[in-house]
């Protein structure tokens, strides 16, 4: 566990199915359009997140983002803002898991996905 550090993992919901369907149907124009939207969205989300003091992008690409956040800088409403912006830019939803370790963040992301997506699940954040 990293004292004072939280991890936020975000992942677009059902993106793989959209890509698979486009490829299987031979609709490369749709896949290309989705890819461009995802690239733009992830660049935008990365900039939005990194503009917050204490927030650092660990990785961002495809429909995934990982953010290391100083505990005192964490704001749940900012995660919701990132989720809303992803939807505005792509038309799809995004789930997030936040945890006191990268493993916990990943588990919380998997929980959010298992519950249907478009959800933020967090560990209890220490005060």
Regions found by a protein language model. Name each.
Residues 1-127:
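Regulatory and interdomain segments flanking nucleotide-handling catalytic cores
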